Amino acid sequence: MAENRMRGPSKERLLDEAEILFAEKGFEGVSVREMTRAAGCNLASVNYYFGNKENLYMEVFRYRWMPRAKRIHNNFRQSLQTQKPLSLSHIIQSLGMAFLRGPLCEEERRCHQQLMARELAQPTAALEMLAQEIMRPFFQELTDMLRPLVPEGLEESELMLGAMGIFAMILYFSFGRV
């Protein structure tokens, strides 16, 4: 029974509108009333589907942000399959293209980046969830790819800083388009 109500169109509309409003105004900047009005739902629907505003916020990240991040990562991996053996320049180029010209439409990219920027500026429990489930595994995968291509004797900390620097530059240009 609970599963049927979770799939209702009101829940999807709430997730859609909450994502847009959270991206534009942040968690604290939007009220439950504003979200339900935008979604055309009853005020009690946030409680009914999510329990509270905080849970709705987490669900926006879980069911909207995380799948988009996985699409970007998959786009990166697919690009890498076109060239064997891998080179440092191909990894960096593929990473940049996945974030700058990747699989997201303009509206998805804008929401995705605004949500992340707001979460970084005012962290909540969502940031730890994203770090554990998306960011750390992806960053580990990236450094594992880079390790055999960098000079022998390079310290692990230097590799991590280099990878973070590359990633930061790509994100800087990607976020600059918001």
Where are these regions (language model features)?
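Hydrophobic alpha-helical connector segments
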Residues: H73-H112, L159-I166
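Short, leucine-enriched amphipathic alpha-helices that occur as contiguous helical runs
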Residues: R7, K11-L15, E19
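All-alpha amphipathic helical-bundle segments outside canonical DNA-binding/catalytic cores
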Residues: L130-E133, V150-F167
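Helix-turn-helix
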Residues: R13, L21-N55, E59-Y63
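Amphipathic alpha-helical segments used for helix-helix packing
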Residues: E107-Q132, R177-V178
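N-terminal intrinsically disordered/low-complexity leader segments
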Residues: M1-P9, I72, F76-L80
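Alpha-helical DNA-contacting segments of helix-turn-helix folds
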Residues: M58-R64, R68-R71, I134
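Amphipathic alpha-helical packing segments from all-alpha helical-bundle domains
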Residues: H90, T124-V150
